[in-house]
Amino acid sequence: MAGLLQIRDALALHGNVQALQLSRQLAAPLPLVQAMLERLIAMGKVERIEQDNSACLSGSCKSCPEGQKCSSTVVYRLK
């Protein structure tokens, strides 16, 4: 089972990481990873960043059927 230290180490290694990526990397359930990230945020060790993807490089995101889902991405990083 993944612990707070493994989450912290993965963030240190990879920089900005989505919770789903951490979940897959650590083979831990996504709700568990999200809860641990929230705990690390409360401890002042991690920050949550909402990235705006509206400036798509190809310019085709507005017509993309997946466009609504990827309008913003939440990533986490160490403080």
From Swiss-Prot:
Stretch forming the signal peptide: none
Organism domain of life: Bacteria
Positions with a binding annotation for iron-sulfur cluster: 56, 61, 64, 70
One MF annotation (Gene Ontology) recorded for this entry: iron-sulfur cluster binding
Keyword terms, alphabetized: DNA-binding, Iron, Iron-sulfur, Metal-binding, Repressor, Transcription, Transcription regulation
Family annotation (InterPro entries): FeoC, Tscrpt_reg_HTH_FeoC, WH-like_DNA-bd_sf, WH_DNA-bd_sf
Record keyword DNA-binding present: yes
Function of the protein: May function as a transcriptional regulator that controls feoABC expression.
Family of this protein: Belongs to the FeoC family.
HAMAP family: FeoC
Name of the protein described by the UniProt record: Probable [Fe-S]-dependent transcriptional repressor
Record organism: Serratia proteamaculans (strain 568)
